Regions:
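Predominantly extracellular/secreted and cell-surface proteins with exposed
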Residues: 92-162
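N-terminal mature ectodomain segment of secretory-pathway/periplasmic proteins
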Residues: 59-118
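Short helix-loop boundary/capping segments
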Residues: 130-202
Length: 238
């Protein structure tokens, strides 16, 4: 859920390196709607999420920044029972597959990351990719009441090379921002940001995943972005 965009970015890099005011009183507005973000995330874990996506960005190869574009699919099936860090959990794997084109060359790709949630309350426990094993320092729950303009820190992941947790890679800090709806009662935009740091607390990468959530706590993907010293990536849901 939280680190998928960093995985997309790494894969793209690997592919190409290897190849107003008024004078009258305003009408009274209804109070802002309250949304249950934790319930929305729990529904997403239970029901899954999928979308066609467009890809764009830049990748630096041999000191030269090259633009790329592409398209693919984002799939996140319903979670299944699993074990994570010695405890019962739910696992949900996000996969992005498709093709990207840069400098006249088109390459196919497929990459995935698996997120883990507590079976009891749906708290986020951590995630695993091909090169990392990340564990929440404390189980992460999203707020149960948010309104447009809400924001806050969610928690911190400890990053390791593998499940032995013997080699530290640093930390990842998670936060969220809720966008103010254009119209009262309309769906609300949610941005979940992951800032990735090395063991010296140097910022390596910033990833943002954007969701839309209805008043019924149904979440859909809007897009995602990632940025590090090697380039940028923007993912836009069709």
């Amino acid at each position: 859920m939280h680190g998928a965009s960093k995985t997309y970015l790494a894969v793209c890099f690997a592919i190409f390196i290897s190849a107003c005011g008024g004078g009258t009183a305003a009408p009274m507005q209804p109070p802002p709607a309250n949304f249950d973000l934790q319930a929305g995330m729990a529904k997403m874990v239970a029901n899954g999420l999928s979308s066609n996506v467009a890809l764009s960005g830049t990748v630096t190869v041999n000191g030269v920044s090259t633009a790329f574009t592409g398209s693919g699919t984002f799939t996140r099936p319903p979670a299944i029972s699993a074990t994570f860090n010695g405890t019962a959990a739910l696992s949900q794997t996000t996969t992005v597959a498709g093709s990207v084109t840069a400098a006249g060359q088109t390459k196919s790709y497929s990459t995935s990351v698996t997120d883990y949630y507590a079976s009891s309350d749906g708290a986020f426990l951590g995630e695993v990719s091909a090169s990392e094993y990340d564990v929440a320092q404390a189980p992460i729950l999203f707020p149960t009441t948010v309104v447009g303009g809400s924001s806050g820190t969610l928690g911190t992941l400890s990053r390791y090379t593998d499940s032995t947790m013997s080699v530290s890679l640093g930390t990842a800090q998670l936060s969220y921002v809720v966008m103010i709806p254009v119209d009262p009662g309309s769906s609300m935009g949610i941005a979940v940001t992951t800032k990735i740091y090395d063991t010296q607390n140097t910022l390596l990468e910033t990833d943002v995943t954007n969701y839309t959530m209805t008043s019924s706590n149904v979440i859909s993907l809007s897009g995602a972005s990632a940025q590090n010293q090697s380039g940028t990536l923007t993912v836009t849901a069709d």
